[in-house]
Amino acid sequence: MKATDLFHVTALVAGALALEHQQPLIGDLSQDLNHIIDSSPLLSFHRALVQIPSISEHEKNVGEYVLDFLSSQNLTVEKQIVTPESDTEEERFNIYAYVGKNRQPDVLVTSHIDTVPPFIPYSLHAPTSGTSFIRTDLVIAGRGTVDAKASVAAIVFAALETLDENPNASIGLLFDVGEENSGVGMKHFSNSELNPTPPTYHTVIFGEPTELSLVAAHKGTLGFKLVAEGKAAHSGYPWLGESAISSLIPVLAHLDTLQDLPPEKGGLLRSETLGKSTLNIGRVHGGIAANVVPAHAEAAISVRLAAGTPEDTRTIIERAVAKVTSGDRSVYPDFGDRKAGAPPQYFDVDVDGFEVITVNYGTDAPALKIHDQRTQRVKRYLYGPGSILVAHADNEAITVGELEEAVRGYKRLIAASL
């Protein structure tokens, strides 16, 4: 659901009334909206997750809550330490849960428990003021309500309902830390004994905001810095120095055009599935004062890859920089670890009953290395409630109906995978 659709009550009500099981209208807007949440274990669990701040690198409290909750549901739960507690850092850990002694399940369902800053408190809102509304249209707002605590909550209850119906279902749950800024949690899991070679699981279901659609593909990622070195001087005598900022600007201007240039003319790569690769100049800084010729400047740049590998895009960037600078090495791209970045990711969409889309954002999927697929290909699905368009915004929100439908969606994916 698009963010703007959250408040289009007329359309939502019309769609809801077409459902087999119609719901009564809630007409008394003065009633305690918390009662709707209190009466649902799913919604109560989601509320508890959102009420606990878990900005990346500070996930411990919400992790403990999830661990305790899963333990209370008679699952075997492991705390996989990612970063030990120290005087300067709090403990960071993934949560890995499974049934009984089945430590290597057939189906792995995963999402992340960290959020982007800042923390925004949990709140409930009727879709409009002064009109009746259907329960499923109740809006739940706050940081993480969508990304990705909606997926975490829906995954947990989909798994519990599946196990209630089929106690022998071979399901594992992984909730990791650090997805929003480093991928450290999934990388740690990927390199651990829980991800053997060859893999014991045959399906992985990733939980992210997909508007309840299956994702066929998402773009890859590459981050780098563009650095310019100059020579400081008094601004009254600029010819005695070399302005790093002035050197940086024309190169940035050219890089900014690469997403629109065709590849045969030096532009970024494209694909029929994902369209154009895009480039964002996210941060620029340099110099020390207005009356000093700047000796250093740099820009932080992010590329979303629609095709090819990170190394392909590095080559395109290097050639583009050299074209503007004529080989002057005082302006150069700094890629850091040349093993960093990820190519576009492709997912399975062979389960009926879902719309299929592509998305431009990245996920934990490339961080989970499936080490050997020679004997059996591991299927990967990407699905979840909520819209990415509000996921990192100050209006992050989801409806009750989306959360509840996500449980049904995850159950269908799990059932198709068992």
Swiss-Prot record:
Zn(2+) 2 binds at residue 147. It is found in: Secreted. GO terms for biological process: proteolysis. Zn(2+) 1 binds at residues 147, 180. InterPro entries: ArgE/DapE_CS (IPR001261), Bact_exopeptidase_dim_dom (IPR036264), Peptidase_M20 (IPR002933), Peptidase_M20_dimer (IPR011650), Peptidase_M20A (IPR050072). GO terms for molecular function: metal ion binding; peptidase activity. CDD domains: M20_ArgE_DapE-like_fungal. Belongs to the peptidase M20A family. This is Probable carboxypeptidase AO090166000075. It comes from Aspergillus oryzae (strain ATCC 42149 / RIB 40) (Yellow koji mold). The lineage of its organism: Eukaryota, Fungi, Dikarya, Ascomycota, Pezizomycotina.
